[in-house]
Amino acid sequence: MINYLKFNRFCFSKKKFFHKCNLPYLLHNQIGSYNSFLSSKYNSLFSIKKVLKQYFPLICNNKNIFIKLKKIELLEPCNTEKYTKIRNLHLFSTLYMYISIYVINKNLNVYKKIFLGNIPSMTKKGNFIINGIDRILISQFTKSYGIYFYTEKKKKKCIIIPLKGSWLEFIITNNFLIVFDKKINFEINVFLICLGYNKKYFFNFFFFKIKIKIIRGKKRIFFLLNKKKYFYKIYNKYICISIKKILGKLFGKNYFLKKNTFLKFNIIDINKVNLILNYPIYFFFIIFLKKIINLNYLIYIYKNFKLKINKELLQYKKGYIINFFRNLFYKKKYFYSLIGAKRIFKRLFLKKNNKLTIYLEIIKKILKFIKFNIQNDNFDNLENKLILNCGKLLSIKFDFLFKKVIKFINYKMNNFKKYKDLDFIVNSDIITIGLKDYFCNNELSQFLDQNNPLAEISHNRKISLISGIGIEKENCGFDIRDIHYSHYCKVCPIDTPEGHNIGLINSLAYLSKVNKYNFISTIYKISILGKILGITFLDNKFDKHKFIVNFNSTIETIYGEIFRSPYFEARKTNYYYYKKFLNIDLIEICGDQIISVGASLIPFLSHNDANRCLMGSNMQRQAVPLIDSENPIVGTGNELEIGLNSNYNILSDLNGYVLYSDNYKIIIKNNNFIKTYFLEKYTRTNQNTILNQYTKVLKGDFVKVGNIIADSNSTKNGEISLGKNLRVAFMSWYGYNFEDSILLSSSILNKNNFNSIHIYEFITVLKYNENGFEIVSNECFGSNEKIKNKVKNGIIKIGEFVFSKDVIVGKMIPKKKRKFSPEEKLFKIVFSESNFNYYEQPLTVPKNIKGTIIAVNDFKIFYFKNKIFKLLKFEQLNYTCKNINNFFYETFNYYLTKIKKLLFNNKITIKKKRINSYNININNIFKIKCFNKKINFKLNIFKNIISNELLKKKNIFVYKKINFIKHDDFENSIIRIIKIKIAVKKQIAIGDKMSGRHGNKGVVSNIIDYENMPYDKFGNKIDLILNPLGVPSRMNVGQLLEVFLAGSLNLIKSFFLKIKNLNKISYFKMKLFIKIIFKCIYDKNINLNIFNNSLVLKIFKNIKNQLNVCVHNFYNFNVNKVNNIIKTIGINKNCELLLFDGITGKRYLQLVNVGYIYFMKLNHLVIDKIYSRSIGPYSIVTQQPLGGKSNLGGQRLGEMEVWALEAYGAAFLLKEMLTIKSDDILGRIELYKNIIKGINDANSGIPESFQVLMKEIQSLCFDIKIL
């Protein structure tokens, strides 16, 4: 059903949306795992509480002191996110534990609250703030806990991976070895003896005994070989089988026969069977194998089932080895985990957890693995991979650090002498410093990509293979980097970086999430006997045995969702079967389920080559947020969901009216509550882009829960928007768009279409040293009066426009102390050198930066009595106090007026002093009581709100105020920090990189005058010219479909834009326009007679303001719909128009494809890249200039550039480039002398790289010389 009154986008494809609550939150991977790490519930698999409870209770060696854990407490961060970023601090929560210490000798029982350390706190966006910088812990692939059988270099191996403890590896070569952590080797017999096994137990496990009755004078003998083959009963208790079935089989005996004795492990033949028959023995014990296994290794183990050590050494080493094994498999040190235990039981077909038999079962399984060539376990399968997300990684690190804390506690307990020793029983720096170092140095802790909202979400959903499974970049082959069938709908096959990390850094699929067991799961519709029942999340362990069909296999009817046809191609693992709909188990949800968040924003994805889709998803993350961006005309339907999940816009938390609204805050009032929302204004990100929010509501508007009340510069109407819709033509224009070059119209610059704001932060630090204090002075700025008006106390004012090399902070550094003569002092005073003990070291604006000062943060730390005290800036503390106090008194006065109205309406008199808002005691309000039960009930509601909400917040504020000063983390020598932010506006320029959503990237080669751009017969100019040769070879045909569809829709929109005054148009014409549009797009005839004129006007305004469509990926999109729209409007079939040259006015011979395309400006700007080199460093070996801006390198003349010069025949220019301008040392020196003397002559010699080549040839024993 189409909602005619309210819609964001017209939908071309019919898509079944499931309920919003089932859609996984895109940041759930980070936020959910971190919350479970902090969870106080013991059920959480890796919470702090579970880690701590493993080590308690603690008992000292002499059993005199006993420590018991009572509870833990985690307090909220004392600083705000904004404050920590300004002050370059850490955002963290404080962790306390409550313990009871029992000292038995002294009858002491002490209950203590102990500070354990600081735990880094996560923001709403899923990142951490470390040293004032947004950082993120990306997830990591690792091998799942359990048992694996595999072959490596033609060796059969078995490995056991526990959660805690050493990895056990069974290797079968000439000897049967067991390896611990790939270091310590044991033979299997030593391993089994140390675990407590003996011969009898070992053979009772692998063999079993049966009684066999021997009947003399018969041609048959009765044995039990295999219960499944050739058996029949003669007597009640015996099973018969012919002698042929036991020839060559292994058995042993327990009873000795008369005269002849049978040795163990004899092979029976017919003669020996006859020997048995000749003796009068009726019952005989035989040992048979339980199952068929490799007997050679079993006999080897049996024969060598003694330690191969001398008897003298055995007394010393045996006890050591046994103790080693006991400690190795101690419960607290060796733990399989719940997942590992399940995998082992399932693989070995065990029902009970019997520690005595588990290793014997493993040996039996290994022998089967060798004998029958059982299939190897695949480590690339997601069933065998765990995801270590940020909560799990922090839990592992916290466990490692807390072991050190326990060692410290044990040391204190064992050296306990006085009661005061218990005060310092825990060293809190172990956890605080350990976690801080982990975030600063670990390769999984990365600088958050905040280029735009999409980049931030994608970075949150990244998964790394590096170092997780022991993988290094250099040694990774194609098998590790390649996609696997288990990745389907769980890991995106497209989204991965280009270069040496390809395939090693992956991204979660759009509808996948990490479950509580740390496996990737995705959402499916459940089908049982052809009926679609509901929705569930399943990981690869469960869905590998199911038949799964495509999302297009169902259709909606009035009776619900049903299958389209009786038979389908169903997928099971990596095979496809033709199955009836009754046998289908699971159905996919939608086409975006396969791909990642970035790839889901590419329209017509199925029409593009996979390599270009990869580039498209990577390019979108590099797009710069513009000042005024646009929503794409053609979208995929996911723009709104990604925009809402990015937290870049603000949603209302309650139903109510807007009480106040401006560009800095929005206040919403409800019947019982008032909430204030503060907007982010010109906030700097890690990539120097901005986040700027602006209000979408006005005073008096009614909002509901979930309504968008504030948008940002990267989102529009809630949808993510990163670029602009431009009118494009695929044609050649005087050779300027050669290869991937892009031509732009100057009208784009005039309209400021691709303008972006970048914020640069500059910091200067004032320190105290032996010579004195570093100071800030106005003298660095010079004596110009205009400049002095811009400066205040040595620092430039907010709002001033600055250029490169301008001084913004006048920093002065003290000189070494020395005595000046009276004449020197007089000389400096006369020439007004007041600061003659200092020299200047000002902070200046770097090259290529000019902009406006938008913020100056000055943090002072005062000096007193030769000691430096870290004090907070008084104004900053006042600011925070003021905000919280204002909120407290606003809400308090609101409820106070409610109480006054209640008392006044019910004519209840009370003294004015009790409820005077200027001088009020809160306790007086709590004392107010009424005899009327109804009034008293309402009063109690207001009292509870005041006590629970307001007083709690007041207490939290007091706690924060106390802890503000405690956690400043500066060096001892720092006395002042000054941070200045400059906002720089950057226009599009020649050399900037631009891209579409289909991987069609290029560099702006020229910006053409508006008058010279091609135009159509109506005089409409082209904004963008692309090379048509860039489409067929790249196979990204999706951009053409976008151009045709967006071009036809924009033409419809142009009809509406011409109607400026809606009062002049009749309602009949409005209805006619709406009917035509719905007929074109939806192919439906709508009856507008059921709507009144006001509703028709509302629909008409919606279409006029926004006529955007969405085409869902991988759906059966009918291209004929686009053709129908084009025909209805009256354009050529392929959107081909006749264009005219803007310079000559002549028309082009051929028709040109013209339409609209969504284009973005990428964060590869020419201003940041181009620089000049006059002098610089040279390479030691080749003596050529170094490369790169950071090395002050030169421009490299590569092989293709040489070809270009050769093609033009520029021999002398080429000679210069390859000799004196490169690595001809003698030629360089001579040219420098000639330039000084004014001689226009350049003689080149032999380049140094040629000398290197000569030495390399000579090293190969070739006698070669330069003639």
Swiss-Prot record:
Its EC number is 2.7.7.6. GO terms for molecular function: DNA binding; DNA-directed RNA polymerase activity; ribonucleoside binding. It catalyses: RNA(n) + a ribonucleoside 5'-triphosphate = RNA(n+1) + diphosphate. CDD domains: RNA_pol_B_RPB2. Keywords: DNA-directed RNA polymerase, Nucleotidyltransferase, Transcription, Transferase. One of its GO terms (biological process) is DNA-templated transcription. It holds the Pfam family RNA_pol_Rpb2_7. GO terms for cellular component: DNA-directed RNA polymerase complex. The keyword Nucleotidyltransferase applies. The RNAP catalytic core consists of 2 alpha, 1 beta, 1 beta' and 1 omega subunit. When a sigma factor is associated with the core the holoenzyme is formed, which can initiate transcription. DNA-dependent RNA polymerase catalyzes the transcription of DNA into RNA using the four ribonucleoside triphosphates as substrates. Belongs to the RNA polymerase beta chain family. This is DNA-directed RNA polymerase subunit beta.
